Amino acid sequence: MSLASIPSPHTGTIDLGPLTIHMYGLTLLVAIAACILLTGYRWTRQGGDWDLILKVAVWGVAAGIVGARAYHDITSWNEVSSPKWKGVFAVWQGGLGVWGGILLGCLVGAYVAHREGASVLKLMDAVAPGLLLAQGIGRWGNWWNQELYGKPTSLPWGLKIDPENRPAQYADFTTFHPTFLYEIIWNLSLAGFLVWLGHHRNIRPPGLFALYVAGYSAFRIFEETVRIDPAHHFLGLRLNLFVAVTLTIVGLVWFARTQRRAPVTT
């Protein structure tokens, strides 16, 4: 039994009179705002304008939420609350697949940027640290919901989970690996590194975005070996582990290729 632990909130909501605030949703809003502010700051430092960032954000965020929920529902259909047609949209209960959100959000955002005549590749590098910042902040939502934690641990930073939120096979354990905290630390560290790299090295776009894909996915390789939440498996391993390995390789190859070709001027 651990002598020290990280406490978990006993509820994921806060009542303010007749208003019930879902902390997962509030965390998501804060994460989105942080991403927009950091991206806007980086973009305007390059001579861009805020109007483009706001236009991209409106469409990209909406598409990202749809993509994230769709990825979760497709890969975890058996976990969607009943009735299923309502559970599909219950984002306040948790359940957003980050890869689906990034894919659809970036595709739609890139389309908007291209339509406005902006450099899509440069914008991708501008947004990369912001995405990591948003993902780091967003993981606090998992803490509020007591979800997506790791295997049992007796380490002093183990996360205390209420009995009703523990898997049946781990009912006798009290503290678990706080994977949400691991990811927060990793994402914020990687975001800081990308900002530093962009300022001190001549990285050709979208090199920073490629490193974001590789770096985040590399962490997920570790995380997927620790998490114990229900997941689809392929060849005895979690499906998301295969996705993480694939994207780590893709990101590294992508980065290498971007740094070999001629600098982007448009």
Regions found by a protein language model. Give the residues of each.
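A feature for loop-to-transmembrane-helix boundaries and adjacent hydrophobic helices
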Residues: 1-266
